[in-house]
Every structure is written in structure tokens, then in C-alpha cells.
């Protein structure tokens, strides 16, 4: 997998990182953002990728490389009725990549709006985004269980908001919590791994060590 050098999808489009990358599947941003790019940029991307706005079995089957760019409504917050975009797209990516590779594949899935919701100190959105991300994790674990040779790693690059759980009532099903910050914090984040070589990811680790270990495993 090539590393795309920017977090901004618009910048990725402008530099034409996508056509020159080794990516087989991507889904990000929205089709509206794609349409705002210069015609020559759109043309170059479409030369390499089949671009779809909605899941299309016929187009997916015919494609050699796929870009799924849904409408803005599907990438909004779960509080804005996004639906099951993240878990369903995770399943789409797993199905697409596993059917086209005899030597395995690397897939990264990000629940980006967990961070955004924490920056806003929005309790409800954080909880709902985490539960939505958990469904994407479930899709990955189910595939790994069936495949038997897939490693799944779940973590975060940082904590946001310093969310503290203060008190709760099991009978009422309620929990009191408070945010201490609206920014990133040095609080440690969980690291979970399931599958072959998962023991490499136990204990307390520097996050840069996680990526180095992934690269070492991919090189084997």
C-alpha cells in the first residue's frame, strides 16, 4: 500500500496521489467533493478506478480498482442519520479485496467522527460513533475467524477530550461523565489485536512501534 501524503482528500485529488498509488479500493469524502475537482483530475482518477456513488454489484464485479464515493448524507454524523455506511463499507471492502487477492490484503478503516465528536464534547455522538465503529470491527473479526490467517488490529492514534466516567446506575442504565478538554490529550489509548501474531501487540507500546510491527509482518 502506498502512503497518501495528506489528510485532506481535496489535496490528494489535486496532487493526483490516487492514480499513482497502489491502492485497489478506497472510500472517503463524498461524490460532491470529487465533482468539484478539475476535469483533468477526475479523468485521471477514473482511468485507474471505477467510481461509484452507490453500491453497484455489476460495476463492482467488472472493476479492477474501485472508489466508492457516497453522497454527503452518508458520511455525516450518526446523529444526522448517517445509517450503516461505515460497517457496510467495511464489509464491501473486505469482500472486494479478499476476492481479488491470493496473497492477502491490507485494509485500514477509520472511525474519524469519534474524534470530531470528542472535540465538540458531544457525549451522545461519541457513544453512537463508537458503537457504529464497533460494527465495523465486528465485520473484520467475522472475516478473520472464517479466514484463519488474518490479523485484525484496533487502536487510535490519540485520545481526545479526556473523557472521564464519574458515576453511574446499572439499574437505570445511566452513566455520568465529563470532558476535561476539547483537544488531544496524552492519555493512553487501548490496543487490541486478534489473529496470527496478535501477541506482538500486547502490553504498553509506543504507537510508532505498532506501525513498524505491521510493516515487518507485511514484509514476511
State where each predicted segment sits:
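Active-site His/acidic residue clusters
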Residues: 72-77, 90-94, 101-104, 108-136
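Metal-dependent active-site segment of extracytoplasmic phospho-/sulfohydrolases and closely related
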Residues: 131-170
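Substrate-binding rim/cap in mid-to-C-terminal beta-strand-loop elements of soluble/periplasmic
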Residues: 180-207, 211
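Solvent-exposed loop/turn segments at secondary-structure junctions
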Residues: 1, 31-35, 58, 73-76, ...
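Structural recognition of the beta-strand scaffold that forms the well-ordered cores
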Residues: 24-29, 67-70, 105-110, 115, ...
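Loop/turn elements at helix/coil->beta-strand transitions in domains of secreted/extracellular proteins
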Residues: 21-25, 47-50, 64-66, 99-106, ...
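Single conserved hydrophobic/aromatic residue that forms the stacking wall/gate
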Residues: 2-13
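Long, well-ordered, tryptophan-enriched scaffold segments
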Residues: 26-75
Amino acid at each position: 500500500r502506498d502512503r497518501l501524503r495528506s489528510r485532506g482528500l481535496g489535496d490528494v485529488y489535486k496532487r493526483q496521489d490516487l492514480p499513482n498509488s497502489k491502492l485497489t479500493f478506497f472510500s472517503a469524502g463524498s461524490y460532491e467533493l470529487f465533482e468539484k475537482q478539475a476535469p483533468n483530475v477526475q479523468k485521471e482518477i477514473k482511468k485507474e478506478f471505477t467510481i461509484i456513488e452507490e453500491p453497484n454489484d455489476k460495476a463492482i464485479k467488472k472493476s479492477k480498482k474501485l472508489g466508492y464515493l457516497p453522497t454527503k448524507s452518508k458520511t455525516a454524523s450518526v446523529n444526522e442519520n448517517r445509517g450503516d455506511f461505515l460497517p457496510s463499507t467495511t464489509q464491501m471492502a473486505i469482500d472486494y479485496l479478499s476476492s481479488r487477492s491470493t496473497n492477502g490484503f491490507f485494509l485500514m478503516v477509520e472511525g474519524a467522527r469519534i474524534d470530531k465528536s470528542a472535540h465538540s464534547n458531544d457525549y451522545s455522538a461519541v457513544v453512537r460513533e463508537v458503537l457504529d465503529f464497533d460494527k465495523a470491527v465486528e465485520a473484520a473479526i467475522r472475516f478473520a475467524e472464517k479466514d484463519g490467517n488474518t490479523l485484525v488490529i484496533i487502536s487510535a492514534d490519540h485520545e481526545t477530550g479526556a473523557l472521564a466516567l464519574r458515576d453511574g446506575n446499572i439499574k437505570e442504565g445511566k452513566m455520568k461523565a465529563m470532558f476535561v478538554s476539547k483537544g488531544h490529550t496524552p492519555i493512553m489509548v487501548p490496543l487490541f489485536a486478534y489473529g496470527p501474531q496478535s501477541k506482538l501487540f500486547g502490553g504498553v507500546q509506543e504507537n510508532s512501534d505498532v506501525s513498524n510491527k505491521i510493516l515487518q509482518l507485511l514484509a514476511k
